[in-house]
Amino acid sequence: DKTMTVPSVTGTRQQQLEQWLQDVFANQKFILDSLPGDASARQYHRIQLLDNDAVETGRYIVMDSADEQDALQQFINVAKLMAPAINVPTLVAQDMAKGFLVLQDFGTVEFAHLLVDAPAAQVNDYYQLALRTLVALQAVPVATAKTDHQLPDYDTALLNREMDLFSEWFIPYIGIELAQTLWENLKSALIAEILAQPQVIVHRDYHSRNLMQDQADHTRLGVIDFQDAVIGAYSYDLVSLVRDAYVEWPEDQVSSWIQDCWQLQKQAELATADNAAQFENDVNVMG
Protein backbone atom coordinates (compact mmCIF):
# COMPACT_ATOMS: atom_id res chain seq x y z
CA ASP A 1 0.00 0.00 0.00
CA LYS A 2 3.01 2.29 -0.28
CA THR A 3 6.42 2.55 -1.89
CA MET A 4 9.25 4.31 -0.12
CA THR A 5 12.89 5.18 -0.65
CA VAL A 6 14.40 7.11 2.23
CA PRO A 7 18.20 6.81 2.00
CA SER A 8 19.06 9.36 4.69
CA VAL A 9 16.28 8.78 7.22
CA THR A 10 16.92 5.90 9.57
CA GLY A 11 15.28 3.87 12.29
CA THR A 12 12.53 5.35 14.38
CA ARG A 13 12.70 8.68 12.56
CA GLN A 14 11.91 6.95 9.28
CA GLN A 15 8.96 5.15 10.85
CA GLN A 16 7.64 8.41 12.33
CA LEU A 17 7.91 10.20 9.00
CA GLU A 18 6.36 7.30 7.09
CA GLN A 19 3.42 7.00 9.47
CA TRP A 20 2.82 10.74 9.51
CA LEU A 21 2.79 10.94 5.71
CA GLN A 22 0.37 8.02 5.55
CA ASP A 23 -1.94 9.98 7.84
CA VAL A 24 -1.53 13.22 5.87
CA PHE A 25 -2.18 11.59 2.50
CA ALA A 26 -4.85 9.12 3.63
CA ASN A 27 -2.78 5.98 2.99
CA GLN A 28 -2.09 6.80 -0.65
CA LYS A 29 0.87 5.04 -2.20
CA PHE A 30 3.95 7.21 -2.38
CA ILE A 31 7.65 7.31 -3.17
CA LEU A 32 9.89 9.37 -0.89
CA ASP A 33 13.31 10.47 -2.15
CA SER A 34 15.85 12.30 -0.02
CA LEU A 35 17.24 15.55 -1.45
CA PRO A 36 20.72 17.02 -0.94
CA GLY A 37 20.82 18.94 2.33
CA ASP A 38 22.17 22.33 3.27
CA ALA A 39 24.49 23.16 6.16
CA SER A 40 21.70 22.82 8.74
CA ALA A 41 20.27 19.81 10.56
CA ARG A 42 17.18 19.99 8.35
CA GLN A 43 16.53 17.21 5.85
CA TYR A 44 14.45 17.56 2.71
CA HIS A 45 12.59 14.91 0.72
CA ARG A 46 10.39 14.87 -2.37
CA ILE A 47 7.21 12.81 -2.03
CA GLN A 48 5.47 11.54 -5.17
CA LEU A 49 1.89 10.39 -4.70
CA LEU A 50 0.81 7.44 -6.85
CA ASP A 51 -2.54 5.99 -7.85
CA ASN A 52 -3.24 2.24 -7.99
CA ASP A 53 -1.64 2.06 -11.44
CA ALA A 54 1.55 3.69 -10.11
CA VAL A 55 0.79 6.90 -12.03
CA GLU A 56 1.93 10.06 -10.26
CA THR A 57 -0.94 12.18 -8.97
CA GLY A 58 1.05 14.86 -7.17
CA ARG A 59 4.36 15.77 -5.61
CA TYR A 60 5.42 17.80 -2.60
CA ILE A 61 8.49 18.71 -0.56
CA VAL A 62 8.81 17.27 2.95
CA MET A 63 10.94 19.12 5.51
CA ASP A 64 12.24 17.13 8.48
CA SER A 65 13.50 19.45 11.19
CA ALA A 66 13.58 17.16 14.21
CA ASP A 67 15.97 19.15 16.39
CA GLU A 68 15.07 22.60 15.14
CA GLN A 69 11.53 23.36 16.25
CA ASP A 70 12.38 27.05 16.59
CA ALA A 71 13.73 27.08 13.04
CA LEU A 72 10.57 25.36 11.85
CA GLN A 73 8.40 28.00 13.47
CA GLN A 74 10.59 30.72 11.98
CA PHE A 75 10.19 29.14 8.53
CA ILE A 76 6.40 29.26 8.91
CA ASN A 77 6.50 32.85 10.22
CA VAL A 78 8.62 34.05 7.31
CA ALA A 79 6.55 32.13 4.75
CA LYS A 80 3.38 33.83 6.04
CA LEU A 81 5.10 37.21 5.89
CA MET A 82 6.33 36.79 2.32
CA ALA A 83 3.38 34.91 0.79
CA PRO A 84 1.23 37.97 -0.02
CA ALA A 85 4.15 39.60 -1.87
CA ILE A 86 6.14 36.85 -3.60
CA ASN A 87 5.80 33.21 -4.63
CA VAL A 88 6.90 31.07 -1.66
CA PRO A 89 5.87 27.42 -1.16
CA THR A 90 2.35 26.88 0.18
CA LEU A 91 2.24 25.05 3.50
CA VAL A 92 0.26 21.82 2.98
CA ALA A 93 0.61 20.07 6.36
CA GLN A 94 2.59 20.48 9.56
CA ASP A 95 3.36 18.73 12.83
CA MET A 96 5.41 21.05 15.00
CA ALA A 97 5.89 18.49 17.78
CA LYS A 98 7.41 15.95 15.40
CA GLY A 99 9.22 18.55 13.30
CA PHE A 100 7.60 17.76 9.94
CA LEU A 101 6.29 20.04 7.19
CA VAL A 102 4.81 19.28 3.77
CA LEU A 103 5.23 22.08 1.25
CA GLN A 104 4.35 22.89 -2.33
CA ASP A 105 6.99 21.60 -4.77
CA PHE A 106 8.12 24.15 -7.38
CA GLY A 107 9.95 21.44 -9.34
CA THR A 108 13.62 20.93 -10.10
CA VAL A 109 14.45 23.80 -12.49
CA GLU A 110 16.61 26.36 -10.68
CA PHE A 111 17.20 29.91 -11.91
CA ALA A 112 20.80 28.80 -12.52
CA HIS A 113 19.56 26.10 -14.92
CA LEU A 114 17.56 28.65 -16.92
CA LEU A 115 20.70 30.68 -17.59
CA VAL A 116 22.70 27.86 -19.17
CA ASP A 117 23.15 28.53 -22.92
CA ALA A 118 20.34 31.10 -22.85
CA PRO A 119 20.72 34.00 -25.32
CA ALA A 120 21.56 37.38 -23.80
CA ALA A 121 18.04 38.78 -24.22
CA GLN A 122 16.55 35.76 -22.44
CA VAL A 123 19.11 36.02 -19.63
CA ASN A 124 18.14 39.66 -19.17
CA ASP A 125 14.43 38.73 -19.07
CA TYR A 126 15.15 36.20 -16.30
CA TYR A 127 17.09 38.77 -14.28
CA GLN A 128 14.36 41.37 -14.74
CA LEU A 129 11.91 38.84 -13.27
CA ALA A 130 14.27 38.18 -10.34
CA LEU A 131 14.67 41.93 -9.77
CA ARG A 132 10.90 42.53 -9.84
CA THR A 133 10.45 39.67 -7.36
CA LEU A 134 13.11 41.16 -5.08
CA VAL A 135 11.57 44.64 -5.14
CA ALA A 136 8.14 43.13 -4.40
CA LEU A 137 9.67 41.57 -1.28
CA GLN A 138 11.33 44.86 -0.32
CA ALA A 139 7.93 46.57 -0.54
CA VAL A 140 6.61 44.55 2.42
CA PRO A 141 6.49 46.95 5.40
CA VAL A 142 9.34 46.50 7.86
CA ALA A 143 6.97 47.23 10.76
CA THR A 144 4.84 44.24 9.75
CA ALA A 145 7.90 42.01 9.57
CA LYS A 146 9.04 43.04 13.05
CA THR A 147 5.77 43.09 14.94
CA ASP A 148 3.73 40.33 13.31
CA HIS A 149 6.49 37.95 12.24
CA GLN A 150 9.38 38.59 14.67
CA LEU A 151 12.08 39.14 12.05
CA PRO A 152 15.35 40.11 13.77
CA ASP A 153 17.59 43.01 12.73
CA TYR A 154 20.74 42.51 10.69
CA ASP A 155 22.52 44.39 13.47
CA THR A 156 26.14 45.22 14.28
CA ALA A 157 26.69 41.95 16.15
CA LEU A 158 25.43 39.81 13.27
CA LEU A 159 27.35 41.82 10.65
CA ASN A 160 30.51 41.49 12.74
CA ARG A 161 30.01 37.76 13.12
CA GLU A 162 29.54 37.22 9.41
CA MET A 163 32.44 39.47 8.40
CA ASP A 164 34.70 37.55 10.76
CA LEU A 165 34.09 34.45 8.64
CA PHE A 166 36.15 36.28 6.00
CA SER A 167 39.10 36.84 8.33
CA GLU A 168 38.87 33.42 9.98
CA TRP A 169 38.51 31.30 6.84
CA PHE A 170 39.31 33.14 3.61
CA ILE A 171 42.35 35.19 4.65
CA PRO A 172 44.27 32.14 5.99
CA TYR A 173 43.22 30.20 2.87
CA ILE A 174 44.92 32.70 0.55
CA GLY A 175 47.93 32.99 2.87
CA ILE A 176 47.71 36.67 3.80
CA GLU A 177 48.25 38.17 7.24
CA LEU A 178 45.69 40.80 8.16
CA ALA A 179 46.56 43.33 10.87
CA GLN A 180 43.84 43.11 13.51
CA THR A 181 43.55 46.87 14.01
CA LEU A 182 43.23 47.46 10.27
CA TRP A 183 40.57 44.76 10.03
CA GLU A 184 38.54 46.10 12.96
CA ASN A 185 38.66 49.64 11.53
CA LEU A 186 37.59 48.42 8.10
CA LYS A 187 34.70 46.43 9.59
CA SER A 188 33.53 49.41 11.61
CA ALA A 189 33.56 51.67 8.56
CA LEU A 190 31.67 49.15 6.42
CA ILE A 191 29.10 48.40 9.12
CA ALA A 192 28.42 52.11 9.67
CA GLU A 193 27.69 52.54 5.95
CA ILE A 194 25.58 49.38 5.77
CA LEU A 195 23.43 50.32 8.77
CA ALA A 196 22.83 53.77 7.24
CA GLN A 197 21.26 52.25 4.11
CA PRO A 198 17.44 51.97 3.83
CA GLN A 199 16.22 48.94 5.78
CA VAL A 200 14.05 46.27 4.15
CA ILE A 201 13.27 42.57 4.48
CA VAL A 202 16.42 40.68 3.51
CA HIS A 203 16.13 37.09 2.26
CA ARG A 204 19.88 36.54 2.99
CA ASP A 205 20.36 33.87 0.31
CA TYR A 206 18.76 35.41 -2.77
CA HIS A 207 20.77 33.69 -5.51
CA SER A 208 20.40 31.43 -8.53
CA ARG A 209 19.98 28.19 -6.56
CA ASN A 210 17.24 29.50 -4.29
CA LEU A 211 15.07 30.85 -7.10
CA MET A 212 13.04 28.21 -8.94
CA GLN A 213 11.02 28.17 -12.12
CA ASP A 214 7.51 27.46 -10.84
CA GLN A 215 6.40 24.48 -12.92
CA ALA A 216 2.76 25.48 -12.48
CA ASP A 217 3.39 29.03 -13.72
CA HIS A 218 6.57 29.80 -15.67
CA THR A 219 5.93 33.53 -15.44
CA ARG A 220 6.70 33.45 -11.70
CA LEU A 221 9.83 32.56 -9.79
CA GLY A 222 9.42 30.38 -6.71
CA VAL A 223 11.54 31.58 -3.80
CA ILE A 224 12.93 29.06 -1.30
CA ASP A 225 15.37 28.87 1.64
CA PHE A 226 14.14 32.12 3.18
CA GLN A 227 13.93 31.06 6.83
CA ASP A 228 16.97 33.12 7.90
CA ALA A 229 15.41 36.39 6.71
CA VAL A 230 16.18 39.57 8.66
CA ILE A 231 15.62 43.31 8.50
CA GLY A 232 18.69 44.80 6.86
CA ALA A 233 20.25 46.86 4.09
CA TYR A 234 18.44 47.21 0.77
CA SER A 235 21.61 46.29 -1.15
CA TYR A 236 22.26 42.88 0.41
CA ASP A 237 19.98 40.62 -1.64
CA LEU A 238 20.82 42.45 -4.86
CA VAL A 239 24.52 41.68 -4.35
CA SER A 240 23.63 38.02 -3.76
CA LEU A 241 21.76 38.00 -7.08
CA VAL A 242 24.03 39.93 -9.45
CA ARG A 243 27.35 38.94 -7.86
CA ASP A 244 26.23 35.37 -7.32
CA ALA A 245 28.86 32.91 -6.08
CA TYR A 246 27.58 30.40 -8.68
CA VAL A 247 27.21 32.65 -11.75
CA GLU A 248 29.58 35.34 -13.03
CA TRP A 249 28.71 38.24 -15.35
CA PRO A 250 30.74 41.09 -16.88
CA GLU A 251 30.82 44.13 -14.62
CA ASP A 252 29.03 46.33 -17.16
CA GLN A 253 26.12 43.87 -17.17
CA VAL A 254 26.06 43.81 -13.36
CA SER A 255 26.06 47.61 -13.31
CA SER A 256 23.12 47.68 -15.72
CA TRP A 257 21.07 45.35 -13.49
CA ILE A 258 21.94 47.44 -10.43
CA GLN A 259 20.56 50.53 -12.19
CA ASP A 260 17.47 48.57 -13.24
CA CYS A 261 16.86 47.65 -9.60
CA TRP A 262 17.14 51.29 -8.55
CA GLN A 263 14.54 52.24 -11.18
CA LEU A 264 12.21 49.49 -9.95
CA GLN A 265 12.59 50.71 -6.36
CA LYS A 266 11.71 54.24 -7.46
CA GLN A 267 8.67 53.00 -9.42
CA ALA A 268 7.51 51.13 -6.31
CA GLU A 269 8.03 54.33 -4.28
CA LEU A 270 10.44 52.60 -1.91
CA ALA A 271 13.07 54.42 0.12
CA THR A 272 16.18 54.36 -2.07
CA ALA A 273 19.24 56.37 -3.05
CA ASP A 274 18.79 59.82 -4.59
CA ASN A 275 20.50 58.75 -7.80
CA ALA A 276 21.74 55.62 -9.58
CA ALA A 277 25.41 56.38 -8.83
CA GLN A 278 24.75 56.52 -5.07
CA PHE A 279 22.76 53.30 -5.24
CA GLU A 280 25.58 51.55 -7.08
CA ASN A 281 28.02 52.82 -4.46
CA ASP A 282 25.81 51.35 -1.72
CA VAL A 283 25.76 48.03 -3.57
CA ASN A 284 29.55 48.07 -3.97
CA VAL A 285 30.01 48.75 -0.26
CA MET A 286 27.95 45.64 0.44
CA GLY A 287 29.91 43.35 -1.87
Give the positions of each predicted feature.
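Juxta-kinase regulatory segment immediately upstream of eukaryotic protein kinase catalytic domains
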Residues: 5-27
